[in-house]
Amino acid sequence: MYQRKIERELRCPLEYGLDIFGGKWNSRIICILFIKGSLRYNELKAEMLDITDTVLSRTLKELMQNNMVERRQYNEIPMRVTYQLIEKAESVIPIFETICQWSKKYLAPDDINNSICGQFLKQDGEFFILAEE
């Protein structure tokens, strides 16, 4: 796993948040695990579509180090491992929902991709998946 040579200096809380759930893959993994629940590695990879094994594995390790994702290993043969969100990661879902609303407002309609990360909204305090249009 990549280790910084110089310790990162976080000057404000926004930098901390963006460091944890920013980037290309972190938010996608969090959204997918929120909507789909606990998934095995290959199930998660199938949802991601264009991610390599190396990048998915590294990103999951980083999310686990940041206490966003939990890896559960079951004592079964063959071995079964699942990944799921923990409370800290679930707490960023309202932030993602707000970002999705903002993006839909300012992004051209032709640029909107109906990816799973854009398919959740809040209604009466509960999140639900949008129907495909």
Language model features with spans:
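C-terminal regulatory/oligomerization modules of transcriptional regulators
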Residues: 1-9, 65, 70, 87-88, ...
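Beta-hairpin "wing" of winged helix-turn-helix
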Residues: 64-84
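Non-catalytic interaction surface on structured domains
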Residues: 16-20, 45-47, 71, 107-114
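Basic amphipathic alpha-helical segments that dock to polyanions
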Residues: 56, 60-63
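N-terminal helix-turn-helix DNA-binding core of bacterial DNA-binding proteins
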Residues: 8, 12-55, 82
